[in-house]
């Protein structure tokens, strides 16, 4: 089973922007009081879950989630920019509704000043290819964003990107995927 990685995906914890209906995009963002509590619960929930390593988006809200959840544990947390949320460009920091109205149009066409969902999926695919070829990683927890999960659904579960982008994002306590050597080699 060389190269097979169990991937556990968790979104960053609740932010002040989430609570206000703001699409943070590539802005840093910060956890709300409730979000800090949820991050602590994430650490408790996953601490004895055979996690070998944590990969985390380098955006502030994801980093804060990882620090609260896994700070003071022996788990190594590696930050990776490829796990970032979609760059909404001119709409970073705009109301969620304004971004949601544009989602389907932005599967292949970038947001003005930003990127497309296919662009974000391609960068996540590069990371998945690296994971699939690494014999040292077996069960990896990823802390990311909506676009990260949609990329996983597309690349690892074979769901059409247009469908996952158009579906509602229902939060839950993690999603699990399997990364195989050939699973992520198609970035679109």
Segments (PLM) and residue ranges:
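Generic structural signal for well-ordered alpha-helical scaffold segments
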Residues: 40-47, 125-133
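Phosphate-handling substructures
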Residues: 69-126
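Active-site-proximal alpha-helix that buttresses catalytic centers in soluble enzyme cores
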Residues: 3-73, 115-118
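Domain-level recognition of soluble alpha/beta enzyme cores
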Residues: 157-185
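Short aromatic-enriched loop/helix-cap "lid" or pocket-rim segments at secondary-structure transitions
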Residues: 19-22, 89-93, 154-155
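Generic beta-sheet signal
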Residues: 7, 138-146
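Short beta-strand scaffold positions
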Residues: 56-57, 122, 143-144
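Glycine-rich phosphate-binding loop signature in dinucleotide/nucleotide-binding domains
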Residues: 2, 47-50, 131-138
């Amino acid at each position: 089973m060389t190269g097979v990685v169990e991937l556990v995906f968790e979104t960053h914890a609740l932010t002040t922007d989430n609570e206000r209906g703001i699409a943070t995009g590539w802005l840093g963002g910060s956890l709300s009081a409730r979000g800090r509590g949820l991050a602590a619960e994430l650490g408790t929930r996953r601490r004895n879950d055979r996690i070998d390593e944590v990969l985390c988006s380098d955006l502030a809200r994801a980093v804060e989630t990882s620090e609260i959840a896994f700070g003071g544990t022996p788990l190594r947390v590696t930050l990776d920019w490829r796990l970032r949320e979609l760059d909404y460009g001119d709409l970073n920091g705009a109301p969620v509704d304004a971004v949601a109205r544009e989602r389907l149009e932005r599967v292949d066409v970038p947001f003005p000043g930003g990127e497309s969902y296919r662009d974000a999926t391609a960068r996540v695919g590069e990371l998945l290819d690296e994971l699939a070829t690494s014999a040292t990683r077996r069960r990896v927890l990823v802390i990311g964003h909506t676009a990260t999960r949609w990329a996983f659904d597309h690349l690892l579960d074979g769901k059409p990107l247009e469908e996952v982008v158009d579906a509602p994002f229902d939060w839950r306590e993690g999603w699990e995927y399997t990364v195989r050597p050939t699973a992520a080699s198609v970035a679109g």
